[in-house]
Amino acid sequence: NQAFVPVMTEYKKNGDEREVRELLAAVAGTLGGIVTIVTLLGVLGSGVLTALFGWGWFWDWLHGGPAAEKFELASLMLKITFPYLWFITFTAMAGAILNTFGRFAVSSFTPVFLNLTMIAAAWWIAPLLERPEIALAIGVFLGGLVQFLFQYPFLRQINMLVWPKWGWHHPGVVKIRTLMIPALFGVSVSQINLLINTMLASFLATGAISYLYYSDRLLEFPLGLFAVAISTVILPALARKHADADPADFSRTMDW
């Protein structure tokens, strides 16, 4: 969003609807192609990824230790949940488009479906499975699919539902790629730290990784409740003021 919304806002202000749709098609096609490859590699290489980020479990799996079963279960669950990356990528893009057009309620409500599908999976699917833990992985997959499908009728309403096409060299895509570099660095620092902690926790007692996850959720709670909500609304407004070349109004909005 940090890279995409400002560029789209600029196109929306300076260009006609056709240029905006061409930008969206190029972004969707380019991003979709990359994410599809990453998703396929993640599904096919789930065992390698689990070994990489769960060294302790992998070590026990190699030597017949007590955590060997955890490695196999984690690998299977990662294989089921990894397509969520594909779904959430396009869900986030659709949400950014809707936010740019002032349709904040749709993207704000969308995450509710992930919670509902996970609860439904735990309630109805888990009793049917030999390994009930798999039900939550299925819930994540279905939650991603439902979120993905939910927003697209609203894109059609604003005539921004486009057919993706490859556009690596499209000027808008080039600009987004340039803006993404610092944004990715800022976002990745905390995630890399969490992955390293997960690697180390895999050598500890059962539940250590869960403790880390719960503490991270607790840390993210105020951020998601206030900071994300404010930034979701204010980013399109700031992007419009930047596109209007109105630094005074931009500054007043930031001061607020």
Segments (PLM) and residue ranges:
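Membrane-embedded alpha-helical bundles of multi-pass transporters/translocases
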Residues: N1-W256
